[in-house]
């Protein structure tokens, strides 16, 4: 009995997954399960893990249905004593004669018999039903490789004639549809590897199968000779597989050229690397090597070309003639709207030049956002197309924003619109018209509120249907920060032939909190609730979080001045003159800043709300108390009067983002601290001496 079967019989599936991170794919209707190890599991050479390489078991009895190769390792891993003592001893200490075969660079295919019928499977599936890159199933490719027209009957007859029904027969499949690195014939081809008895696990070799090819066999005198030969491979050949005398594979020896190419090809699995490939103009060279991945690269190329295509230019030509409000409405749903605002500020239609000014992480994020936007739009069009008959002049406008962002005020300013608001419905249904009781309503348990919320949703829909019957425009003025509510209204709009629009009510958290305190006519909401809403809104609004830029860039510790390390003694916080040199130093905080910077070999970057007019005395103070010569100082421009947290965000975007790996930030002002935390700076030290906002 296999180790894994014994473990399953004693501890069940959960024990296997939790302890060894084995992935299981179940086929309930066939009583089958496919087991595969996690590539980077720390117990990679444990007997249980080693057995789980596309192993197929009966999910009721845990008996073996199809038994593939056990896990075997790369030569370099065996040099590090990974792979178990048995393989290591055989390879390096025994005098056994090995067999060396060409390593075929394709997809593992296993053919086995179950419940009286033969089946083809891949490592991750029981019936080869999974798709390759070009959306062809592997089962279809296997049948093409066998040149079978009447697929099922001919496949059964062929297998019955040539294959042992008590064993699993392993092949490598190559074709243009599943190319990895090495180039083979475009037509699907099966390469025979070995066969294995399902019960005993013994390997054997079938040397005269007429429907497949065989890897080339080499007569190297030693493993070392094979390693040296692999180092000389130049034409994308993968390398070799070393087998013992019993036809069991011991290790893979791969060429350096292949490994480098495989690393490049694997970029196609990573959206960030694909975006980087296109941004750097390397995609043509990449496709010259891997033409079968053209469909994978195309969306990224299309996204990159967004900034020069005619529709983008037309949007900007039109946008520059509009007032600010109309411009906001025009660009609010665009995935490149930040570039649109930059173009408006510069009074240019050259979106491409504004894109080129972005840092590489910003460019990558924008390319990915465009792809996401296009795919979502296409999916929505496909889903809703049958329900949309004619363009409609009726509008369903959904406002999205936190409490205190002005949604209700804006909704009431729209003439001829029916407003739908969940709070209004809550108060009407359950609170006898008393808005001051809403906080108590919100404080009820989720379970207690669930039925009531369902009634509220039902009444909101009834209000919409009533408005739709009259042909009235509708505005929904809730927060709408979850996708479920927006999706619901979008479907309602499509069903009732409404033009669906959303509008982001973008205000600062501080503004919303200030408005909340003034809402004596209704109710002041719990401020913590608004803060939680704001966190959700940042995601909805595609807020650009901080992303480390890689080891090639310097590390930085960011530090505020006034209140954080410097305390005014002879001036107010808003006096920017030579008196800043007289500020008292917070030596304990300064010590922490310097220590953290030294530990991480980081530069200290000062981000100050002070006006640049007092730059020199500020530098003198820094050099006196920090005792450093190498640092950066960014200050408020002399004509800038924006709030402190907005200034710090601008300084961060202009001078830090994409240029430094930020270790931590020190600040004392609550609203600024929240801004740093919103950016997801790894560590934010709040050193304020009082919890009050100022």
Curated annotation (Swiss-Prot):
Keywords: ATP-binding, Kinase, Ligase, Multifunctional enzyme, Nucleotide-binding, RNA repair, Transferase. InterPro entries: HAD-like_sf, HAD_PNKP, HAD_sf, P-loop_NTPase, T4-Rnl1-like_N. GO terms for molecular function: ATP binding; ATP-dependent polydeoxyribonucleotide 5'-hydroxyl-kinase activity; RNA ligase (ATP) activity. Residues 1-385 are annotated as: Ligase domain. It catalyses: a 5'-end dephospho-2'-deoxyribonucleoside-DNA + ATP = a 5'-end 5'-phospho-2'-deoxyribonucleoside-DNA + ADP + H(+); ATP + (ribonucleotide)n-3'-hydroxyl + 5'-phospho-(ribonucleotide)m = (ribonucleotide)n+m + AMP + diphosphate. Residues 394-694 are annotated as: Bifunctional 5'-OH polynucleotide kinase/polynucleotide 3'-phosphatase. Trifunctional enzyme that possesses a bifunctional polynucleotide kinase/phosphatase activity and an ATP-dependent RNA ligase activity. May therefore play a role to evade an RNA damage-based host response. This is Putative bifunctional polynucleotide kinase/RNA ligase. It comes from Autographa californica nuclear polyhedrosis virus.
